[in-house]
Swiss-Prot record:
Protein name stated in the entry: ATP-dependent 6-phosphofructokinase
Activity regulation (UniProt): Allosterically activated by ADP and other diphosphonucleosides, and allosterically inhibited by phosphoenolpyruvate.
Catalytic activities: beta-D-fructose 6-phosphate + ATP = beta-D-fructose 1,6-bisphosphate + ADP + H(+)
Subcellular location: Cytoplasm
Protein's organism: Pectobacterium carotovorum subsp. carotovorum (strain PC1)
Reported function: Catalyzes the phosphorylation of D-fructose 6-phosphate to fructose 1,6-bisphosphate by ATP, the first committing step of glycolysis.
HAMAP family xref list: Phosphofructokinase_I_B1 (MF_00339)
Complexes and interactors: Homotetramer.
Binding residue positions for ATP: 12, 73-74, 103-106
GO CC, any one term: 6-phosphofructokinase complex
Tagged with keyword tRNA-binding: no
Binding site residues for ADP: 22-26, 55-60, 155, 186-188, 212, 214-216
GO MF entries: 6-phosphofructokinase activity; AMP binding; ATP binding; fructose-6-phosphate binding; identical protein binding; metal ion binding; monosaccharide binding
Length: 320
């Protein structure tokens, strides 16, 4: 029987993580459970930095970006001896289960703890929207609004100077954030990690647009596809049009979460408590067709693939 649980946030922060923590804490307390907040992710778990949370611990956090528990990269967690210390710390504190909020790397940590006999539930918290088993991740919609605002502002200055603007968007190997922002922002060109990219082909498309009378353009590109500064130099050289690259960077992770992220995080947090009380461990929570779902965390990490929104890209191309 579950009586006391821990909750931590891990990996890159995402707007809505605080709402998720609040959902976990409030739902657990309603069911008569005790909750301990673990500071700075798996590193804090290893260092035994945790404290009991009550209803007031999560008051006035639903609107705050980031995570008040903190987060940290902790590669040492791959070491089984380090993980054993974490398990011993949780057992000494009387914890029966752990809720982990983060991306696929955080899920891997939860998987390893589950394999050591400690039940964990994973909640998808990342702006990249790259976690399998869920339509959307906590933080994605807030980041989308942040990127869209930046694109709108870039369009203002690009049109004034008849300039080509490249905007680099986060996402790692997933282009969901770039694609959605590009459609909403009316970007003329989209470069995604899921689609083979050729700078030469992009230049041809830009030149075709110029021949049709296009006086400015915005190229939305996901990070890590290429060096955007070098791409800007190449485009300017080949087209004769002033071209500038803007890397949005970590600004995409910040800010007060939008309504949908707050609702999603609250639902997922509460649902994690339902699963634990039903005896589940080694599961990850998702939302599919607006319904809460859960999957085996090993399956989500190793076997499930996020579907590429090819139909969205087809739509975007029709609108250029």
């Amino acid at each position: 029987m579950i009586r006391r649980i821990g909750v931590l946030t891990s990996g890159g922060d995402a707007p809505g993580m605080n709402a998720a923590i609040r959902g976990v804490v409030r739902a657990a307390l309603t069911e008569g459970l005790e909750v301990y907040g673990i500071y700075d992710g798996y590193q804090g778990l290893y260092e035994d930095r945790m404290e009991q949370l009550d209803r007031y611990s999560v008051s006035d956090v639903i609107n705050r970006g980031g995570t008040f528990l903190g987060s940290a990269r902790f590669p040492q967690f791959r070491d089984e001896a380090v993980r054993q210390v974490c398990v011993e710390n949780m057992k000494r504190r009387g914890l029966d289960a752990l809720v982990v909020i983060g991306g696929d790397g955080s899920y891997m940590g939860a998987k390893r703890l589950t394999e050591m006999g400690f039940p964990c539930i994973g909640l998808p918290g990342t702006i990249d929207n790259d976690v399998a088993g869920t339509d959307y991740t906590i933080g994605y919609f807030t980041a989308l609004e942040t990127v869209l605002e930046a694109i709108d502002r870039l369009r203002d200055t690009s049109s004034s100077h008849q300039r080509i603007s490249i905007v680099e968007v986060m996402g790692r190997h997933c282009g969901d954030l770039t694609l959605a922002a590009a459609i909403a922002g009316g970007c003329e060109f989209i470069v995604l990690p899921e689609v083979p990219f050729s700078p030469e082909d992009l230049v041809c498309e830009i030149k075709a647009g110029i021949e049709k009378g296009k006086k400015h353009a915005i190229v939305a590109i996901t990070e890590l596809v290429c060096d955007v500064d070098e791409l800007a130099k190449y485009i300017e050289k080949e087209t004769g049009r002033e071209t500038r690259a803007t890397v949005l960077g970590h600004i995409q992770r910040g800010g007060s979460p939008v309504a949908y992220d707050r609702i999603l995080a609250s639902r997922m947090g509460a649902y994690s408590i339902e699963l634990l009380q039903q005896g589940y461990g080694g599961r990850c929570v998702g939302i599919q067709n607006e319904k809460m779902v859960h999957h085996d965390i090993v399956d989500a990490i190793e076997n499930m693939k996020r579907p590429f929104k090819g139909d969205w890209l087809d739509t975007a191309k029709k609108l250029f």
